[in-house]
Structure formats: structure tokens, C-alpha cells
Amino acid sequence: MRFVDEAVITVEAGDGGNGVASFRREKFVPFGGPDGGDGGRGGSIYIQADDDTSTLVDYRYTRKLRAERGKNGAGANCTGRGGEDVVLKVPVGTTIVDTDSGDIIGDLVEDGQRVMVASGGEGGLGNTHFKSSTNRAPRKCTTGTKGEFREIRLELKVLADVGLLGMPNAGKSTFIRAVSAAKPKVADYPFTTMVPNLGVVDADRHRSFVMADIPGLIEGAAEGAGLGIRFLKHLARTRILLHIIDVQPIDGSDPAHNAKAIMNELAKFSPTLANLPIVLVLNKLDQIAEESREEWCQHILDELQWTGPVFKTSGLLEEGTKEVVYYLMDQIEQQREREVEDPEYAAEVRAFREQLEAETREQTIAAKEAYRAMRKAQRLESMMDDDDDFDDDEDDGDVESIYVRD
């Protein structure tokens, strides 16, 4: 199934049914009085997180969703039937944003979590409500109110504890295959991974975390090179970034230069995201002769001036991967325990997450607008090149036909 992580839809709740003006007519009951029932409430629209849904592709093709209108009231004080609610299922990790105001309506992070995005209209009142001591036969009734109408944007960000970062062909997909049951495509050409992949990593029987593999970045991604930065937003909910470095790139490029390029692109996209804890993994050690591995790895670290945690692995041979898994599991558990035990730290983490969410959303929207503007400019330029007489000059040798009516 095609992976779609963003969609814009319009939702319209059902209108309320109308109240009616009716009078009781029954044998042996003179002056029966009003008995008009109320209209039914219009159906509302809800969005619900669902573990069995993994993409927003359904909402790329069905963009207008409407709930049922409430039924009108009837005599004998019968209230009209309420309109049926509509429940839209989306993947866990979906954020709902009002496109007009930019406000976040809801953030669905748990299976079954539900948010109302459009409220159904209230049913109208029947004439029973308007009887009084001075007006015993009211003919007044009211119509139902309109249902809420909204345009909303659905944004999916995968939920993972660890995010894999690196150049194309750095070995990210091979690494996640080695440490989890995920089976992303692996090949010897760039951009084999086109969509994010999730894998559950088991440190031991009762300890596990989720790892996300996103498509590779290249230098200039912030300006749209390669697959651009559209998938970087999926790292916004991770706790730790695992930077995979190919120590012997197939194109002969410098590993340290590649790593610096990735860090620069990350900082351009979101300085807050770049402040997440980063663990360095020097991968594909099997490509280097054993006697020169240590020297070459130290050269890369010296070039990067790296002082943080670093591991040396071969994802293909599954060498050194267990040590990475145990380290990540310990770090994640420490973070979780501290959030539970220290309310002040938990509040800081929440504020950091909110800032990161807002920053990645703004950058993603800005990048899309810039891409659209670039494509529009390219189309205009192409049109000008194709039209030899675009400037309306009379001296360019074109033939002009003039039709005259006799």
C-alpha cells in the first residue's frame, strides 16, 4: 500500500432536523393542544487512532466527508432520529490541524483515542416548547442548526524511540533488519528506502523499543536535493538519533564530510531536532582490512571532533549490533524513569517536544511551499521557451491572419 503521511480533507457535520408544529387530534379529547416533536441532532465526525491503519492514503482520494442530517420531528411529541456519526480511522501518531487557524485540534498517540472534529447541529424545537397560559395553540417551531464545517490537515509522524539517520546506502536498512524483525528493502543503489520503516527491537524478553528507518539524506536536502527533508519530521517524536556512517562509501567520498553534511542538513531543518541525543555508529567495518580499522575509525572521529557515544558495527555480519541495542535500551529506560520520578524534568521534556513539533511542522510547510513555487517557476519558464511569439513582437517573422466580414 502506498505510504501517505499528509492529507487535507473537509469535514461537514450533519444539520439538525427541524422541529414541527403539530396538534393532538384524538376522539373525545377536545383542545388536545400542541404535540410537535423536536428535530434530531445531526451526526458528528470523529477521528480515531487505529493500530491496524498505517497510512493516510484513503484521504488522498476521499477529501470531502459528511455526516448524516438529523430527521425532522413528528406529531405525538416524537423526536426525530439523530444523524449517524462518522468515525474516520487514522494511524496512531496522527496530528489534526485546523488549516484556517493553524491550531492543533488533537494529537492521537494511543490506539482507540478519539477526537471530535465537527459537531453535529442541534435539532429544532417543536411547537410544544412554545405553549403558555396565554398561547395554548402555538404554531411556532424552529429549524435545526447547521452542522460544523471545517478544513483540516492530517499529519502522520511515526512513533518511535530511536530514529536512524544517515546518507543513502549507509546501511540503515541493513542495520534495522539485523536488530529487529523489520524487513525493509536492501539493495546496492541509493534511495532504496522510499518510505519510513518501523521495527520493534527486543533487548531481551521483557525489554524492547521501537526504531524508525527513514530515507537517506544528502547534502542540499534542505533545498530539495534527493528526497528533500519531507521525511525528517518523522524523527520529531524520537528520543535518540542513531547516526549511521558508512566508513567506506562506494562512491569514494569522505565519511567525515558526509557525516558533517547530514548534521548541517539536520540543523537547517530544525535546530531543536539537532539537539536530540545522538549516537554515532561507524558501519560497514567489514569493508576495511582488519589491521587498519582502528586507525581509519579514529581518523573519522578526529575529523568530526566527536566526543559523544560511538559504536563500530557491521550490519551485514551483525557484528557489534547487540552492544548498540543494549546501550539504547538503557538510555531509553533511564529517560522514562526520570520522567516518572521528576515532574520538573517531565515538564521540560513536554515543553521541548511541543517546541520540536511546532518547529518541524513550520519547516515542513515552508519546504513544501518553496517546492511548489520552484515547480511553478519551472513551468512558466518552459511555457515561455515553447512560445516563440510570447513577447508579441511584430518583427519576428510570424504570420498574422486577419479575418474581415464582407
Swiss-Prot record:
Its BP terms in the Gene Ontology are:
ribosome biogenesis
**CC cofactor:** Mg(2+)
Q: Which keywords does this Swiss-Prot/TrEMBL entry list?
A: Cytoplasm, GTP-binding, Hydrolase, Magnesium, Metal-binding, Nucleotide-binding
Q: Where does GTP bind?
A: 166-173, 191-195, 213-216, 283-286, 314-316
The record's CDD domains line, in alphabetical order, gives: Obg (cd01898)
For the region Disordered, give the residue spans.
Answer: 120-143, 381-406
* Subunit relationships: Monomer.
Protein name in UniProt: GTPase Obg
Gene name per UniProt:
obg
